[in-house]
From Swiss-Prot:
Gene (UniProt): nuoC2
Similarity comment: family membership: Belongs to the complex I 30 kDa subunit family.
Lineage: Bacteria, Pseudomonadati, Pseudomonadota, Alphaproteobacteria, Hyphomicrobiales
UniProt-recorded name of the protein: NADH-quinone oxidoreductase subunit C 2
Protein localization: Cell inner membrane
Keywords per UniProt: Cell inner membrane, Cell membrane, Membrane, NAD, Quinone, Translocase, Transport, Ubiquinone
Length: 187
């Protein structure tokens, strides 16, 4: 069994310094925390730098950390085929969650970002076609958010869904999650 080579962090830390956070290694994957305003620059650097060559975007997923603040996170998984390195980038987002699109770095980000939008409501600024990918266009809310009712909402396609008044903001002190429909960002 061969040992995978270690990621050379020097070029990354030299370029980004204190603007990112090196979170170490988890399960053999190097992890960095990057603020949303630096995500495109950081991803482009990892892809284009000759010593890095992260040419494969494995996925982008959303995370809802309710009741923590900031509540949302976009997580990017990258792979360098020539170096056999894996990197996870964590990007914490406010509410409503928004981060610049990386479709200009990897075209495959298109579908990953649409999935995170559809399930969590994470808006990817500059995305060429940000619309639902799993749920139908008239669907209300984002089903992977922790404040989404387990039975969904009552409508003509789901007569057994939850009913109730429009939601209020969650009360973080009591961890009370409203039972109504979550507000959705304007298109």
């Amino acid at each position: 069994m061969s040992v995978e080579p270690s990621l050379n962090r020097a070029p990354i830390m030299e370029r980004f310094g204190d603007t990112i956070e090196d979170l170490g290694t988890a399960h053999g994957i190097d992890v960095f925390a990057v603020p949303p305003e630096r995500i495109v620059e950081f991803c482009r650097f990892l892809k284009e730098h000759p010593a890095m060559q992260f040419n494969f975007l494995s996925d982008i997923c959303g995370v809802d950390h309710y009741p923590e603040t900031p509540r949302f996170e976009a997580v990017y998984h990258l792979y360098s085929l020539p170096n056999r390195w894996r990197v996870r980038i964590k990007c914490r987002l406010g509410d409503p969650p928004e981060v610049p699109s990386v479709t200009g770095v990897w075209r495959t980000a298109n579908w990953h970002e649409r999935e995170a939008w559809d399930m969590y409501g994470i808006r990817f600024a500059g995305h060429p076609d940000l619309r639902r990918i799993y749920m139908w266009e008239g669907f209300e809310g984002f089903p992977q958010r922790k404040d989404f009712p387990l039975r969904g909402y009552k409508d003509k396609l789901n007569p057994f869904g939850a009913e109730g008044p429009p939601p209020t903001q969650p009360d973080l002190a009591t961890r009370d999650i409203p039972q109504g429909r979550p507000s959705t960002p304007e298109s």
